Amino acid sequence: MFSFSSELQKVRWQYSHMKMNKKVFDFLQHNEAKYDADGSSVKFGDPNSNIIVTVFSNPYCNPCAAMHKRLQVLYFSNTCLIQYIFTSFNPEWNKINKYLIAVYQQYGAEKAWEVYTEWYDNGKYSQESFFDKFHLDMNSDDIEREFQRHEQWKRSTKFNATPTILVNGGKIPYGYNIEDVQYLS
């Protein structure tokens, strides 16, 4: 029994070691479709990182809220660049995407991350009134330009499911999860 347990532990270590080799990750991702990895200026983390995580997210999506929580590990490790591209599948909800963009543009990345976390935790139930406390200037042309950039990215990729996560423009290979990305840089 002890021998089997030791052997299993050794195999797990070897697998983890191999899995965290960026060359292995890149090789597995090589045959996947590639998408534009610069679809947003809503970015968090290390701007010089060689790892770009693109998050295609719907502010009202519960799995997107769960993904945002999982991304906290990457955000706080500061080992990659995380960019958000917002979508909604109901045009009436586009205003929330614009509010989230406005928070980023008017308060900066650090505060925006906190606000996004609060939104996904329970702010979404308050809808537009959630943003009242921020006194956002919603008449900025920059908000509309960024919103249209997100819309264009959505049209060009033809993604229709959220959350969709890309790493350096490709989908995460089988056997990996988003938390593994912090070890690839």
Give the location of each predicted region:
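C-terminal cap of thioredoxin/glutaredoxin-like
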Residues: 1-4, 50-52, 72-75, 132-185
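Secretory/periplasmic and organellar redox-cofactor proteins
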Residues: 1-48, 144-146, 156, 176-178, ...
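Generic detector of short, locally flexible boundary/turn motifs and exposed helical patches
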Residues: 15-22, 46-51, 127-133, 138-139
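Residue-identity detector for glycine
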Residues: 39, 45, 108, 123, ...
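Structural alpha/beta surface segment adjacent to cysteine/selenocysteine redox centers
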Residues: 54, 59, 65-143, 153-159
